[in-house]
Amino acid sequence: MGLKYFAHLPLELREKIVRDHLQEERKKEFLEKAIEDSCRRHEALLIEDPSPAELNSLSKFLTALSDYVGNQFNTRCLIRWKKDVPSKVKFGFMDEQHHKLYGSMDMDDLSCGELFIPDEEDDLTYEDGVIVRCSQLDQLFKSLGIEIVYIVVSKHCIWAPLSKEIVIK
């Protein structure tokens, strides 16, 4: 609503609009702080040899965060794994995503870590049952006119593109 029209509204209505706006801002700020705290807690799970419970906790958190960020931007949100993240964490997460989407189909005694060249320099993500290089996926989506956002996970940092940039180091 334009400011010139806002000034002509009755005082009670203007106060209600301002109150509602401030309430939404406080909710958003509270959520961002909660996400920031959760990122800090889950950063500790980006270790060389996480337990299955730790990996499950990280997976649930990143999945929920991805859904939230995707809803905020009204687009698809993927997890972008940097090279420095331990393979057991990165591929364990992708393994779990695959099992949630497809069950054990196409995964007979095969670990996701065995599917990829370990010397790869590019960031990775998991999309529709496939481990993909982010640069290739970006090119494909750009050519199709599809916008995506990423939550970037590196060895000691989880970055989510929210209205207030959240970077945990």
UniProtKB/Swiss-Prot annotation:
The keyword Cell membrane does not apply. A motif (LXCXE motif, interaction with host RBR) lies at residues 110-114. Residues 9-22 are annotated as: Binding to host SKP1 protein. Belongs to the nanovirus Clink protein family. Interacts with and disrupts the function of host retinoblastoma-related proteins RBR, which are key regulators of the cell cycle. Induces transcriptional activation of E2F-regulated S-phase and G2/M-phase-specific genes. Inactivation of the ability of RBR to arrest the cell cycle leads to the stimulation of viral DNA replication. Interacts with host SKP1. Interacts (via LXCXE domain) with host retinoblastoma-related protein 1 (RBR1). Interacts (via LXCXE domain) with retinoblastoma-related proteins (RBR). This is Cell cycle link protein.
